[in-house]
């Protein structure tokens, strides 16, 4: 994920340390110079207290709160949402089932639940919200898409996972002063085991569930999108597509901007399109003899713009091969 730290400001980027692990690093990049001005590797805050797997944390979202200089991150494989100070890297709180961190030095950061709860598992798009949904100025709200899925390898988590085969749109009210949390909204959706997103639209007071990886649908349609009234939880719209997708985002369309003529520059490098080669986990271990299947990556040219898409792969480089080895 790449977001603006503030409008037209620096960029916050989720990336990989490649120090034996992937999807475990956050960088702040100066928008003008491209220089990395701040960064965090997850091992630095959790001190190696994890099972040493390549993708032990799996960061999937980050947001920044300028008024407190804090970030909210979603390390999916820790079944947790974490808020920390971006300058000092000090943990503010952790939102998860308290049993996950029980008996560790991080137990003190876990928010204490009030009322009924369905805790998240393998969540995506965990963000601090701008809208006050509970009418309490002493709390902040956090929304997320709860995939509600646990991989078999996580034997300890499986002991308290409820086994429900449905996902949820969740909203929590967090009292940061008292270190408590209430679950103020839980809307079930079709079971989407990975990817996916939740979006609240303040203008309409609607909440959207973007289920990007539906495995057990009767009609074999893999992507499902829901639109609910936030207050009544009434289903307003529902759309499905044949293929999986990573996540969906709301689009605010500026029709005047779209109607303006597109500037066409004369410095495009034109060439032919070739099917990419398959790489292993790390980009320096390429095996050119392995070719990705057509369903795993797509290339198409629209005018002078090349679009590249990949399923479950990260594209780190595109190489154009022209005549006479150019």
Feature locations, PLM:
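Intrinsically disordered, low-complexity Pro/Gly/Ser/Thr-rich segments with frequent PxxP/GP/PP motifs
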Residues: 325-326
């Amino acid at each position: 994920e790449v977001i603006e730290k503030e409008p037209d400001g620096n960029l916050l980027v989720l990336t990989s340390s490649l120090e034996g692990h992937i999807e475990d690093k956050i960088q702040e990049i100066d928008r003008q110079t491209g220089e990395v001005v701040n960064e965090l590797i997850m091992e630095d805050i959790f001190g190696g207290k994890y099972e040493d797997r390549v993708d032990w944390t799996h960061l999937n979202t980050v947001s920044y709160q300028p008024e407190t200089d804090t970030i909210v991150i979603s390390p999916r494989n820790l079944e947790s949402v974490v808020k920390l100070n971006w300058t000092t890297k000090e943990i503010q709180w952790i939102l998860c089932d308290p049993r996950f961190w029980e008996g560790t030095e991080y137990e003190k950061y876990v928010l204490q639940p009030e009322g009924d709860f369905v805790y998240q598992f393998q969540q995506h798009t965990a963000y601090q919200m701008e809208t006050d949904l509970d009418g309490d100025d002493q709390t902040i709200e956090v929304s997320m898409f709860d995939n509600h899925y646990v991989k078999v390898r996580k034997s300890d988590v499986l002991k308290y996972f409820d086994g429900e085969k449905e996902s949820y749109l969740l909203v929590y009210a967090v009292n940061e002063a008292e270190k408590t949390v209430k679950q103020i909204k839980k809307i079930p959706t079709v079971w989407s085991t990975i990817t996916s997103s939740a979006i609240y639209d303040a203008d309409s007071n609607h909440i959207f569930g973007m289920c990007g990886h539906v495995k057990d649908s009767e009609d074999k349609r893999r992507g499902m999108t829901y639109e609910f009234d936030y207050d009544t939880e009434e289903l307003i719209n529902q759309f499905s597509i044949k293929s999986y997708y990573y996540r969906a985002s709301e689009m605010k369309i500026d029709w005047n901007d779209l109607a303006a003529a597109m500037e066409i520059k004369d410095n495009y490098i034109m060439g032919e399109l070739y099917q990419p080669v398959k790489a292993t986990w790390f980009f320096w271990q390429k095996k050119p003899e392995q070719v990705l299947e057509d369903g795993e990556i797509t290339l198409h040219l629209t005018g002078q713009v090349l679009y590249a898409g990949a399923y479950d792969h990260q594209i780190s480089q595109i190489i154009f091969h022209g005549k006479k080895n150019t």
